């Protein structure tokens, strides 16, 4: 059994091979304490963002007595909570959006090529794992990493691609693209 793990055979080897497409970023580790009769029992909570850099991203939270175990649990939770986000030209957002969770608000703006990721802290990890290369983001209110991540995911959830907007409004994608500021009527919607 131990020999199989070292060689990469068996069930675990196949799972690791499949998961190699994902990039994960550790956003935050927090040491937590539980007060018991004999004193304090310490543990760790980890927040991880995972994505394939092609439009799929997820976040997870894990708690354990040791840091590596908390990170592993958070990574598994993130893999179960993957969502797909439509990207314009595979590098930025389709339009400006805002998201909110608790007292935290985030504002995300699409940016021209070459701008880079202008975002702070936890939001940067989301954009890097998502595959966004050009975005301007601002966080207002709570700077708690958990709330910032959830507010960012709330914003990304409300983004619409031109194809979904045109289907909802019963117009052609090319008509919608030509109305975009600086848009090209021949542009292909993703």
Swiss-Prot record:
Lineage: superkingdom = Bacteria
Q: Which GO terms describe its molecular function?
A: rRNA binding; structural constituent of ribosome
| Keyword Acetylation recorded | no
For this record, the Gene Ontology CC terms, alphabetical, are: small ribosomal subunit
Domain annotation S5 DRBM: ranges: 22-85
Q: Which Gene3D superfamilies match?
A: 3.30.160.20, 3.30.230.10
Q: Name one GO biological process term.
A: translation
Q: Which InterPro entries match?
A: Ribosomal_Su5_D2-typ_SF, Ribosomal_uS5, Ribosomal_uS5_bac-type, Ribosomal_uS5_C, Ribosomal_uS5_N, Ribosomal_uS5_N_CS, Ribsml_uS5_D2-typ_fold_subgr
Question: Which UniProt keyword terms apply here?
Answer: Ribonucleoprotein, Ribosomal protein, RNA-binding, rRNA-binding
Q: Does the keyword RNA-binding apply?
A: yes
The record's listing under Pfam families reads: Ribosomal_S5, Ribosomal_S5_C
Question: What is the protein's known function?
Answer: With S4 and S12 plays an important role in translational accuracy. Located at the back of the 30S subunit body where it stabilizes the conformation of the head with respect to the body.
Q: What is written about domains in the entry's comments?
A: The N-terminal domain interacts with the head of the 30S subunit; the C-terminal domain interacts with the body and contacts protein S4. The interaction surface between S4 and S5 is involved in control of translational fidelity.
Q: Assembly and interactions?
A: Part of the 30S ribosomal subunit. Contacts proteins S4 and S8.
Family per record: Belongs to the universal ribosomal protein uS5 family.
- Spell out the protein name for this chain: Small ribosomal subunit protein uS5
Which organism is this protein's natural source? Answer: Nitrobacter hamburgensis (strain DSM 10229 / NCIMB 13809 / X14)
